[in-house]
Amino acid sequence: MLLVAHPASYRTASFIGAGERLGVRTVVASNSCLGLSPTGRPGVEIDFSDPQIAVERIRQFHARDPISAVLGVEDASLEIAASVAQALSLKSNKPQAIQDARLKHQCRKILATAGLLSPTYRVLEPEEMINSEWVGECEFPCVVKPVSLSGSRGVIRADHVNELSAAIVRVQHILKRENPHLDRRILIEEFIEGHEY
């Protein structure tokens, strides 16, 4: 099994351990030689910023050492893992399905098209963030979140205009720190009262 993982992922060792307990040989594909073999295993060095080249590198590895399954171990590796599985004709979710689920604004569009309820929202393009004309259209409280991060990273409630402006700036900084290749758009959506699970 091929695990596609960033070198800083805390999940990789758990997946390798689970594979060992099940008798499954694991190989790690990562964007750093340091993260390739936490247990001395061979690995495949890939560039997460260029998925096409990453898929080709893994395809070349597969030609020498066949892979029977591919698994992305965190949100940022799921699309590459799905693309690899598709290229190698392995079972997996389709890359477009992964992207639609990961990118919050795309997921909201799909839910609306299907007639399912979801919060009202607005997508801010990076160039819109410095222009405050749209702020008058916002209802408070609202929630600010990056379209591309998971695990509640960058999700901030804003109760008034000043908090909204500060939240947008904070999310921009989080996105820059996380990965320079991430989608920079920000979602501003209706706040829905209730328990978060």
Regions found by a protein language model. Give the residues of each.
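A short beta-strand signature within small-molecule sensing/ligand-binding domains used
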Residues: 196-197
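Glycine-rich phosphate-binding loop signature in dinucleotide/nucleotide-binding domains
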Residues: 61-67, 135-138, 181
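Short coil/turn connectors at secondary-structure junctions
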Residues: 22-24, 138-140, 153, 182-183
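ATP-binding N-terminal substructure of ATP-dependent carboxylate-amine bond-forming enzymes
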Residues: 1-97, 128-130
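Conserved ATP-binding module of the ATP-grasp superfamily
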Residues: 117-119, 141-144, 157-193
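Fold-independent oxyanion-binding glycine-rich loops
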Residues: 5-7, 30-32, 146-147, 160, ...
